[in-house]
């Protein structure tokens, strides 16, 4: 496969293609060694990070030395069966990850501010507490 990749070096790749792959639907007990065994068949792997927290379990990042090896691995391993689980292999998109992280950070900050200043809940009760409640006309 490496020979086929070398022949395609002059080919232009789509913008979403990069050296970092994001893998989903992994078996929870998969090891880094098993990941190197699977993904190493398509080229030199620089790094593999397997998720181990509740949010990241079943996912991993694989970083290839060469972008063409990453492209080949993505094409061949999407849908690959590992322990009766079909892998979802995508190109890592940093902008999506940052947007998600920024949103979560902003939500947490907003909740902290609401808690600190006692904001939130029923608006009429808040007005009544502050003496801003006016009786309705009949």
From Swiss-Prot:
It holds the Pfam family RRM_1. One of its GO terms (molecular function) is RNA binding. GO terms for biological process: mRNA processing; RNA splicing. One of its GO terms (cellular component) is nucleus. Residues 16-29 are annotated as: Interaction with pre-mRNA branch site. Gene3D superfamilies: 3.30.70.330. It is found in: Nucleus. The keyword RNA-binding applies. InterPro entries: Nucleotide-bd_a/b_plait_sf, RBD_domain_sf, RRM_dom, RRT5_SRSF_SR, SF3B6_RRM. Residues 19-94 form the RRM domain. Keywords: mRNA processing, mRNA splicing, Nucleus, RNA-binding. PROSITE patterns: RRM. Necessary for the splicing of pre-mRNA. This is Splicing factor 3B subunit 6-like protein. It comes from Caenorhabditis elegans. The gene is sftb-6.
């Amino acid at each position: 496969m490496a020979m086929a990749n070398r022949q395609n070096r002059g080919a232009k790749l789509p913008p979403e293609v990069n050296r970092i792959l994001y893998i989903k639907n992994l078996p929870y007990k998969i090891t880094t060694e098993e990941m190197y065994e699977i993904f190493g068949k398509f080229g030199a792997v620089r790094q593999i990070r397997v998720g181990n927290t509740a949010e990241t379990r079943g996912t991993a990042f694989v970083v290839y030395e060469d972008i063409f090896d990453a492209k080949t691995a993505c094409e061949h391993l999407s849908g690959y069966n590992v322990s009766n689980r079909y892998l979802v292999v995508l190109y890592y998109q940093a902008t999506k990850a940052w947007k998600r992280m920024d949103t979560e950070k902003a939500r947490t900050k907003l909740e902290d501010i609401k808690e600190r200043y006692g904001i939130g809940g029923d608006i009429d009760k808040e007005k009544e507490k502050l003496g801003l409640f006016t009786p309705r006309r009949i």
